[in-house]
Amino acid sequence: LMSGNTKSGISIYQFSLKETQTPGEYRYALTLVQGGERPSDFKGNLRFQVRLLQHDQRKTIPLIGKNSKQDFPVNFKFLHRLEESFNVPPNTTIESLQVKIYENNNSKKAIITQTAQPMP
């Protein structure tokens, strides 16, 4: 399943979320591709939102990167792969992880949005 933005040539080739062997740890993988004849470098940011259930309350929280920011910068020509993990407190159920892709010159409007549910 590919979702993309034909104007920019960017598309999500693969986006998955899995619970690891470690309780409360989830791993996600995202592969972005850029098509076209001679694509120029894509520069932008990714933002992730985690939808979870904790103590019978639904919450949506931003995923924070290693630099303590919500923006995960990307800069690539043809292919970009990101594989990271995050932890949640005990008694928390992850319902989904959403990624939004923004171009550098427009941080208000995402060019692509896709959601992944945890796979067993």
Please report, for each region that a protein language model flagged, where it lies by residue.
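Membrane-proximal structural modules of membrane-associated proteins and complexes
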Residues: 3-120
